[in-house]
Amino acid sequence: TAGSEYKTLLFQEDNSQSLNRDDGTTKNIRLIDKVHVHSNRLQVLHQFEEEGGSHPTRYDVTILVNGLPLVQIELKRRGVAIKEAFNQINRYQRDSFWAGSGLYEYAQIFIISNGTHTKYYSNTTRFKHIHEMEGRPATGRSKKSSDSFEFTSWWADGRNHVIADLTVFARTFLARHALLNILTRYCVFTAEHDLLVMRPYQIAATERILNRILISEYDPKKLGTPEAGGYVWHTTGSGKTLTSFKTAQLASNMDGVDKVLFVVDRKDLDYQTIQEYERFKKGAVNSNKSTKVLADQLASPDAKIIVRTIQ
């Protein structure tokens, strides 16, 4: 599990690595290209057999990205509960993901399906579930956090209609562009070493906000008009702060965007938002307690994301 956590950190935060070749030379490589996503190479591996684990293991379907097994799919027959697939991946982690070169510890996302029902979840959901079953708390949070089958996610379309059927799920979630975007843009590896894979409505909201920014960038006449803005409705507990954080992070890296100013309407929300942003990524956000500090931050090229109350 420590190996999986370390490899997730490498992949999410520091994916440029030095590769020591057999001939003694060294080559700098990127585990994945997050800027030009279509330059990454995808392959599908069926029924890979691992003989070096505690027991011989055969994985159903693995999606390799640049040779690394980043997505693992476990399939069950129709009529079999998909929780059986969840438990099967649990056993893989215990018995064989660490075997050989430990490459399966790079898996970021797991997909489970019985054909009729299909769900996805991050590697730390699985990791924390294992610790829960062993009766001891996982690193960073209590056992009652995102650590069990209940925290797996349904995929959905742009109107939030659930896509449960495996064939339709594969056509959408596993479409090359969609999958690469989820891996490179819509995951957050928190300061507590939780890997959060955004839910479909969070991804849809983020993409629509970024699209409005692009519209304003290409047509300055729309700046300050309703066409350049919009509303996003999320219910209580749906992850609004994660949506806003990822939107701010992606927007701050866009051409033509110098600052992202996140305005909240109450002081307690200011503190709460900053705390949550800090949990998602240490040092990612700049807070302020006076107009002078705000002015300094607006003038500074280093303060990319600023949180401020409306008062």
Predicted regions located by residue number:
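ATP-dependent helicase/translocase motor core
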Residues: 1-259, 268-283, 301-304
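Inter-Walker segment of RecA-like/P-loop motor cores
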Residues: 278-311
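Alpha-helix N-cap recognition
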Residues: 265-266, 290
